[in-house]
Amino acid sequence: MREFVNLKFEEMPKVWYNVLSDLPFKLDPPLDPETNKPMSPEKLLKIFPAPLLEQEVNDTDKFIDIPEEILKEYAVYRPTPLIRANFLEEYLQTPAKIYYKYEGQSPTGSHKTNTALAQAYYNKISGVKKLYTETGAGQWGSALSYSGLKFGINVNIYMVRVSFNQKPARKSIMKLFNGKVTPSPSRNTKSGRKYEENHPGSLGIAISEAMEEVLQRNDSKYALGSVLNHVLLHQTIIGLEIKKQLEKLNIQPDVIIGCHGGGSNFGGTILPFIPDKLSGKNIRFIACEPESCPTLTKGEYRYDFGDTAGFTPLLKMYTLGKDFIPPSIHAGGLRYHGAAPIISALLNHNLIEAKAFSQEETFKAARLFSKLEGIIPAPESSHAIAGAIKEALNAKKENKEKIIVFTLSGHGLFDLNAYI
């Protein structure tokens, strides 16, 4: 019998969790590349609205109330279910119990809507009329287009060219929700014109193009789908729900897993459990990334730009270097040279682990999961499945009844050409 754990809307957390309030160390601040000193709030206000900047630097409040307007939009698809992967367990013949948090039932099919709605709302109340952003595989661009439509904001998206060509359905969704989509690198910006027109692009280049647009205008702000503290904050709705769902089952997780590109999905999943780890509970957190873009497993922990052209502040993070151009893999949402400062600091302090998987291994896991569990996962999410399978097989070798939880961050119904 398939085991679902559903929460009623009344049981859904009405707050986001701020891990910065609990960490036993301080994050290194973003630096102004012109001075190598901490970035002034005045400069950041050119890029982000004040309410999001306040969330970005808040390291005192443990919980941040979710505004009623956002809760009303969350009610369309949240809470999301926690599902036991019974068929996968049986196939693997493992004593482990595997649970997955399914974020694919959001309006645009991934976890990205959790922060897109929040960012659109805070920009709206700040009087912003136009947002510029980047997107890799299109999940973030889709989510922000949807959220912009909900809150009356025009959304302009620079989509990494390789994904722009690979994923036409994602372009259609963005256009359906009135988003304006441009392949990156483009001829629109100085940042884009540095590259040949058929260049595959990268998230770093697309961020540069969006940032360049904002810095040249007075009517626009920038929205980022991952990496920054406030983005991970909004995504903690995932982990907070998981905690409540596991409490209903009266079980404690041994391992929590998520795919990792910039860190929003992984952070949103594991951050609410960090206090448990800090209090001495034996719980592991595993970030699963692609071998072709091994930011956490092979990157350097240092200050670097978040984009290719150098428009962003310098962030202390694991990085492959701002000029790194990843191979044109199908998991376009994971093709990022850097990582969230929060996730990077947790890894540097040995509070989390990171593992890299090949595209072949992740798609093997994705196909198996599709056939057994009946959900076709996004290529990005497939890295978490591969990680969960690996942990379940280790439990089988050790003959241990581990509780494994992972987030299935989105469905792959718009990525079917990757499965052919």
UniProtKB/Swiss-Prot annotation:
Modification N6-(pyridoxal phosphate)lysine occurs at: K112
GO cellular component: cytoplasm
Catalytic reaction annotation: (1S,2R)-1-C-(indol-3-yl)glycerol 3-phosphate + L-serine = D-glyceraldehyde 3-phosphate + L-tryptophan + H2O
Signal sequence coordinates: none
Keyword Nuclease in record: no
Phylogenetic placement of the source organism: Bacteria, Thermotogati, Thermotogota, Thermotogae, Thermotogales
Protein name: Tryptophan synthase beta chain
Alphabetized UniProt keyword annotations: Amino-acid biosynthesis, Aromatic amino acid biosynthesis, Lyase, Pyridoxal phosphate, Tryptophan biosynthesis
HAMAP family for the chain: Trp_synth_beta
EC number(s) per entry: 4.2.1.20
Domain of life: Bacteria
Gene name per UniProt: trpB
Essential cofactor(s): pyridoxal 5'-phosphate
Family of this protein: Belongs to the TrpB family.
Metabolic or biological pathway, per its Swiss-Prot or TrEMBL entry: Amino-acid biosynthesis; L-tryptophan biosynthesis; L-tryptophan from chorismate: step 5/5
Assembly, per entry: Tetramer of two alpha and two beta chains.
Native species: Thermosipho africanus (strain TCF52B)
Keyword Transferase on entry: no
Physiological role: The beta subunit is responsible for the synthesis of L-tryptophan from indole and L-serine.
Molecular function per GO: L-serine hydro-lyase (adding indole, L-tryptophan-forming) activity; pyridoxal phosphate binding; tryptophan synthase activity
